Regions:
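C-terminal binding/interaction regions
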Residues: 1-79, 84-117
Length: 117
């Protein structure tokens, strides 16, 4: 069986030691699709959903970037990294589904896949 990086030789959870890795440019792109029911798609105006509390997708973009910056606080064993860039976009396709893309970049010893997701 292949070694699982977050389990040590004593079968205990551990954070991966990245101290000996070189600092390199890291990039991750995550994409998700959210399909809405008709009663929601009928509320789309100019590519967003207007609500009493403001534009839903714009608020989601802000919250998504905030979450990417705090990934290490939310997922055990993620390394704290200072993102160099986090670009989050939400676009509607012809059927009214939201296509969500997040691209994260950093120069670090570890990747940014979890932050992008």
């Amino acid at each position: 069986m292949k070694n699982i990086t977050h389990i040590n030789k004593d079968n205990k959870p551990q954070m991966v030691d990245v101290s000996k890795k070189r600092i390199t440019a890291r990039y991750a792109h995550a994409q998700s699709t959210v399909v809405f029911p008709k009663e929601i798609t009928s509320r789309f105006v100019n590519g967003d959903i207007a609500s009493a509390k403001g534009p839903v997708f714009s608020t989601a973009i802000i919250a998504g970037v905030m979450a990417a910056k705090k990934t290490y606080e939310l997922i055990p064993f993620c390394h704290p990294i200072g993102l160099d860039d986090c670009e989050l976009n939400i676009n509607l396709d012809e059927a009214g589904a939201a296509i969500i893309n997040c691209i994260c970049k950093v120069e670090h010893r570890t990747g940014v896949e979890m932050e992008a997701m």
